[in-house]
Every structure is written in structure tokens, then in C-alpha cells.
Amino acid sequence: MVMACAQQGDILWLDKEEQYVLVLSREFFNHSGMSVVCPLRDNAKPDALHIEISSDEYSGTALLEHLRSLDLQARHYRKISSIMYEQIQDITDAVQGIFDYYPYSI
């Protein structure tokens, strides 16, 4: 069975890992078969890299320091829900902050 391509903001359940993840990468990248995701937890304390999310079916915290890329075509997963645009915007801004270049002098 061919599964639809995951979309940015999708909350997925990974069967083998038995965990929820949030898809952070955009569709043009996800069509490669790979997707950048972060794990979701029910009981993590919110901070700069732990951002709370909610949808009709799930609420928890995205752990942005644990980004990873997954081959979703090779995994069994279920789409649980999607988060709102404003939430994905806050999350991608925080992730970008991890990689921003700030020159400094020694």
C-alpha cells in the first residue's frame, strides 16, 4: 500500500518506535522519501527548544533538540493529526535559531 506523502505539521505515530513525531520538513523534501521530524512527549517541561503543540487529537511538547531524518517510506506510521500554521511557524523559527550564524570575536 502506498502512503500519501507526509506534510509539514503532521503528527505521526511510528509503529516500530512506538512514539509520536512531528514532521518539520516541507513537502518538496518529503517527496524524496525522507522527512525531518522531532519527537513529541506528553510530559516535557516547555522551554526554548521544548514547544507545546496541540490539535484536536493530540497535545504535547515538541523536543526540537532531537531532530532527525527518517525514511518514512520504509516505516509503518499513521497520521494522527496536524497542527495549525501558527504553531509550525513558531517551531520552524526555533529550529532556525539553532542554525543561525552569529559571528563573534575571540
Give the location of each predicted region:
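Conserved functional hotspots at enzyme active or ligand-binding sites that engage polyanionic ligands
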Residues: 1-106
